[in-house]
């Protein structure tokens, strides 16, 4: 079934935007409310990004289960190192079996600001104005108990993947 991108509503949840290509949307898309993608092939799937915390990521994975039950996620690609694109990696990577792939630069950045740093930042008194800003930006998210697995594979430039017989090209920008 061909989908026209113009006909995809900007509503919360999973939307098929092309044959076996899905967008997971989180309106309003503000700070921390990132989107993710899912590319399903004949027997597996590639997930583009996880979300900012484990609860949000689990809700997303639950909404994808109608696809991933027949096409399990075996690759996760993190587009960059911001937490709202990778802090849910432990739910699919590591012991859960999916290979995590990102750029060399993103892999270095992922180590620089672990989830525990944001958790600690939320507990420090930095004055009313800064505390208010931090609460607005990070208050809706839960950073405790997040263990961020290291990427299994990194690249620079371009990388071509075979995801269950479907070619996916990654391009570092």
What name fits each language-model region?
Residues 15-68:
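Conserved beta-strand hairpin/beta-sheet module of binuclear metal-dependent hydrolase folds
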Residues 43-44, 55-102:
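Active-site metal-binding motif and surrounding structural segment of the metallo-beta-lactamase
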Residues 27, 50-51, 80-81, 105-106:
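Active-site metal-binding loops of divalent metal-dependent hydrolases
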Residues 52, 104, 165-167:
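A mature extracytoplasmic/lumenal domain signature
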Residues 16-17, 108-172:
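Metallo-beta-lactamase
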């Amino acid at each position: 079934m061909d989908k026209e991108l113009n006909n995809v509503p900007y509503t919360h949840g999973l939307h098929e935007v092309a044959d076996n290509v899905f967008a997971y949307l989180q309106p309003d898309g503000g700070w921390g409310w990132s989107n993710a993608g899912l590319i399903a092939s004949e027997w597996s799937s590639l997930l583009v990004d996880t979300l900012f915390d484990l609860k949000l990521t689990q809700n997303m994975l639950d909404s994808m289960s109608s696809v991933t039950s027949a096409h399990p996620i075996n690759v996760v690609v993190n587009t960059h190192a911001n937490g709202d694109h990778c802090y849910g990696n432990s739910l699919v990577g590591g012991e859960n079996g999916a290979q995590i792939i990102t750029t060399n630069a993103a892999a270095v950045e992922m180590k620089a600001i672990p989830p525990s740093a944001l958790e600690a930042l939320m507990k420090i008194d930095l004055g009313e104005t800064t505390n208010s800003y931090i609460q607005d930006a990070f208050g809706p998210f839960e950073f405790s108990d997040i263990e961020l697995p290291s990427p299994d594979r990194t690249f620079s430039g371009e990388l071509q993947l075979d995801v269950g017989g479907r070619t996916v090209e990654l391009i570092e920008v």
